[in-house]
Amino acid sequence: LTNFVIVGGGPAGVEMAGALAEFCKYILPKDYPEYPSSIMNIYLIEAIDELLSTMSDKASSKTLTYLKDLNVKVLFNELVSDYDGSEVSTKSGKKILAKNLIWTAGVKGQFPKGIDEKHVVKGNRLKTDSFLKVEGYKNIFAMGDIAAMITTDTPKGHPQVAQTAIQQGKYLGETILNRLRNKPIKPFQYKDKGSLATVGKRKAVADLAKFKFTGYFAWLLWSIVHLMSI
């Protein structure tokens, strides 16, 4: 009952792992001194080799450091293959006893059969050009979570968040109409409003356009944005 397994190393998974770890480290010893904090184990399982894959390398590595400091057990390159309510199984054969499984990994990107796998990049995303056209095809487009428009400014593609899908959806609708009307089209321009993730008490990571920072000030910014959205 005291083992928690979180699946997915995106913002939701990272924030959940940080919150549970903070509870284990600070609240449990204070409110329940009869229970040692060692009885609570927190696992974060990620299918690829990094956390916060759509954020900067700095944000990813710092997040891992924060979680390790909080004694979160981070497992990379692991896929959950089964869960029977008591035990989590991964494709590599690992078994973790846990009554508490929290799924934050979302869903796997799906696309029609026939798409050449050489156009599929990390995260099962389709590589597109600057017009959101899938590379290697004339009339196949991709947008939202499944699209990866890789450029110098976005080496990992755009963030897999609602704002990206909204902007790309609007752009693609206008672009397809302009193509049908033989009108000139412009490449997609993403208006980056920044990415934030909190990793426990007074710790966070922030990617804001050309500015990337971590720690207390990133957490303070996250708190302000969160309060403004309520």
Protein language model regions, located:
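Active-site flanking residues adjacent to catalytic metal/cofactor-binding acidic residues
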Residues: 7, 14, 45, 143-144
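C-terminal, flexible cofactor-proximal segment of oxidoreductases
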Residues: 164, 168-230
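Hydrophobic/aromatic beta-strand patches that form the interior of the parallel beta-sheet core
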Residues: 43-45, 75, 102, 141-143, ...
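A conserved short coil-to-beta-strand element within the FAD-binding core of flavoproteins
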Residues: 76-87
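FAD-binding core/adjacent interface of flavoenzyme oxidoreductases
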Residues: 1-7, 12, 23, 102
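FAD-site-proximal beta/loop scaffold in flavoenzymes
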Residues: 1, 86-89, 95-167, 174
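Rossmann-like dinucleotide-binding cores of NAD(P)H-dependent redox enzymes
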Residues: 3, 19-78
